[in-house]
C-alpha cells in the first residue's frame, strides 16, 4: 500500500492521498506507481513549502499546490502516456539489419571454405534465427527481476559451470565443452553472461564500506577461477577487464563509502603489477614450460618465429585497401570465426573489415547511450556491463587479427561464426532492450521500496 498523508485542505474535503490515488488509477503500468507517487508528492510538498514561505496557511498552501497540479484524472492520463514500457522498434530494426549484414559477411567468407561452405552458411542462418528469437524473449522480461535475484542467479550460474568443468569434464582437443540435449556447445563465451549479473550484484552493495570489498572480490574471483580450467587465457583476461571495468565505474560513481581514488589506485596497481611480477618470477625460476616461454617471447618480440602470429601479421601487412590479397590462402582454420576480420581483409580488402568494426562500434556507442541515460542505477550498470562485453570482445578480436597478442579463442560480435557466441551476443542485446523498454517505468525509488539494497 502507498504511504498515506493525513494533511487535508479546508473542511477536510480533499486529501493529498486521494488526489494521488485518483492520479495513479489512470496509470496502467503498476510498476511505475511507486516512482510516480514519490515524484508527484515531492513536487506538491515543494510547492507547499514555497507557498508557506509566502505567508499562506498550511491548508491554503496545500490547496494552491493541488490546484497547480491540475485535474488528477487529466494529469494521470498524460503521465500514463509517458510511464509505460517503451517499444524499441528502431533499435530492433537496426539489429535486424545488422543481422542480415552478418549473414552476408558469412556468405562472402564461407564461399571460400572448401566442401562445407553450404553447411556453414545454412548453420549461421539457423543460429541467427534462434539468437534473434532469444533476444526478443529476454527483451520482454523485466530486467529488474535479474537484479532482484542476481546473487541467486549468479550462484546457480557458477555451480552449473563448476559441475560441467570438474564433474562432467567434456574435453575436445583440450577445450571444455558441454552437452545440452543432443548439442555439444563450447563453454568459453557463456561466461560473458556473468558480466551484467556482476553489475546487478554491485548494485546490491551500494552505500556499503570496506566490509563489502572481500565479498565483491569473491564474486569477481569465482568465475575467473573457473575460466582458468577451460583452459583459455584470452577469456580469463577479457573477463577480468570486463568485471574490473564495472567495479571501477561503480566506485567512481560513489556507490561505496570508502575513498574511491585510493581504492582504484591500489586495485589497478595490484591488478597490473601482480601478473607481470608472477610471470617474471616463474620464468626466472624455471617453472614455465618451454612452449609457454616461447609464447611470451612471441607476444613481445615480433622477430620470434611463431607460425600463427607470423601468418596473422603477414595477412594484415599484405592486405589491399580494396580487393583480394596474395596472402589470402594462408589462413584456413577459424577463417569464419576467430579470424573473421583477417579473412575479410585478405579476400575483400581492409575497407570491408573496417566497415564491420565500425558497425559494431556504433552499436556499442548506442548501448552506452541507453545505459548512461537511465534514471535507474541498476539498469545503467547492467547496460554498461553488456556494452563492456561487446567492446572488450571486439577489441581483443582486433588485437588478435593484427597479431598483437598471441592467437587464442576470440570472437567478433555478430560476425563470427558460432551458435553459442551468437546466442550470447543476442541475449546481452535483449538485456539492453529490456533496460530501454522500462526506462520510464522503473526507478531507484521502486528498488528501495522493494528492499533490494541488502548486504
Region annotations inferred by a language model:
Residues 162, 186-250, 431:
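Alpha-helical transmembrane segments of multi-pass inner-membrane proteins
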Residues 260-355:
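Hydrophobic, glycine- and aromatic-enriched re-entrant/interface helices and adjoining loop segments
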Residues 370-409, 415:
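Loop-to-helix entry and N-terminal half of a specific, functionally important transmembrane alpha helix
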Residues 58-115:
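Cytosolic juxtamembrane regions of integral membrane proteins
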Residues 404-405, 410-455:
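A juxtamembrane structural motif centered on a specific transmembrane helix
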Residues 1-2:
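Short, small-residue-biased leader/transition segments that mark boundaries at the very start
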Residues 217-222, 234-282:
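Hydrophobic alpha-helical segments of polytopic membrane proteins
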Residues 126-131, 346-367:
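Hydrophobic alpha-helical transmembrane segments
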Amino acid at each position: 500500500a502507498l504511504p498515506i498523508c493525513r494533511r487535508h485542505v479546508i473542511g477536510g474535503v480533499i486529501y493529498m492521498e486521494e488526489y494521488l490515488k485518483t492520479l495513479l488509477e489512470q496509470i496502467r503500468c503498476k510498476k511505475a506507481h511507486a516512482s510516480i507517487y514519490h515524484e508527484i508528492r515531492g513536487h506538491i510538498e515543494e510547492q507547499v513549502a514555497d507557498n508557506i514561505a509566502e505567508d499562506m496557511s498550511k491548508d491554503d498552501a496545500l490547496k494552491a499546490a493541488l490546484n497547480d497540479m491540475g485535474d488528477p484524472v487529466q494529469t494521470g492520463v498524460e503521465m500514463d502516456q509517458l510511464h509505460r514500457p517503451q517499444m524499441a522498434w528502431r533499435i530492433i530494426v537496426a539489429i535486424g539489419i545488422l543481422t542480415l549484414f552478418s549473414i552476408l559477411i558469412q556468405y562472402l567468407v564461407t564461399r571460400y571454405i572448401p566442401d562445407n561452405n553450404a553447411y556453414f552458411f545454412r548453420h549461421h542462418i539457423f543460429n541467427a534465427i534462434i539468437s534473434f528469437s532469444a533476444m526478443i524473449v529476454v527483451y520482454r522480461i523485466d530486467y529488474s527481476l535479474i537484479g532482484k535475484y542476481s546473487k541467486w542467479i549468479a550462484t546457480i550460474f557458477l555451480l552449473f559451470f563448476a559441475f560441467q568443468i570438474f564433474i562432467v569434464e567434456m574435453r575436445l582437443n583440450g577445450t571444455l565443452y558441454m552437452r545440452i540435449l543432443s548439442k555439444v556447445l563450447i563453454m568459453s563465451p557463456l561466461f560473458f553472461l556473468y558480466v551484467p549479473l556482476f553489475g546487478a550484484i554491485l548494485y546490491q552493495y551500494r552505500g556499503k564500506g570496506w566490509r563489502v570489498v572481500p565479498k565483491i572480490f569473491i564474486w569477481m574471483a569465482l568465475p575467473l577461477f573457473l575460466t582458468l580450467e577451460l583452459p583459455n587465457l584470452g577469456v580469463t583476461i577479457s573477463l577480468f577487464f570486463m568485471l574490473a571495468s564495472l567495479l571501477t565505474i561503480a566506485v567512481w560513481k560513489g556507490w561505496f563509502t570508502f575513498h574511491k581514488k585510493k581504492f582504484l589506485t591500489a586495485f589497478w596497481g595490484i591488478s597490473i603489477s601482480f601478473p607481470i611480477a608472477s610471470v617474471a618470477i616463474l620464468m626466472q625460476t624455471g617453472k614455465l614450460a618451454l612452449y609457454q616461454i616461447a609464447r611470451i617471447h612471441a607476444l613481445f618480440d615480433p622477430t620470434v618465429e611463431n607460425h600463427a602470429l607470423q601468418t596473422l601479421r603477414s595477412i594484415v601487412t599484405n592486405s589491399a585497401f580494396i580487393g583480394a590479397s596474395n596472402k589470402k590462402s594462408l589462413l584456413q582454420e577459424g577463417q569464419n570465426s576467430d579470424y573473421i576480420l583477417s579473412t575479410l581483409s585478405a579476400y575483400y580488402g581492409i575497407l570491408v573489415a573496417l566497415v564491420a568494426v565500425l558497425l559494431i562500434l556504433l552499436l556499442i556507442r548506442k548501448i552506452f547511450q541507453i545505459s548512461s541515460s537511465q534514471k535507474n542505477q541498476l539498469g545503467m550498470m547492467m547496460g554498461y556491463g553488456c556494452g563492456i562485453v561487446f567492446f572488450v570482445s571486439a577489441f581483443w578480436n582486433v588485437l588478435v587479427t593484427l597479431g598483437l597478442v598471441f592467437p587464442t579463442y576470440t570472437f567478433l560480435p555478430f560476425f563470427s561464426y558460432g551458435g553459442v557466441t551468437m546466442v550470447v551476443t543476442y541475449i546481452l542485446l535483449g538485456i539492453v532492450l529490456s533496460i530501454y523498454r522500462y526506462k520510464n517505468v522503473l526507478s531507484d525509488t521502486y528498488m528501495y521500496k522493494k528492499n533490494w539494497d541488502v548486504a
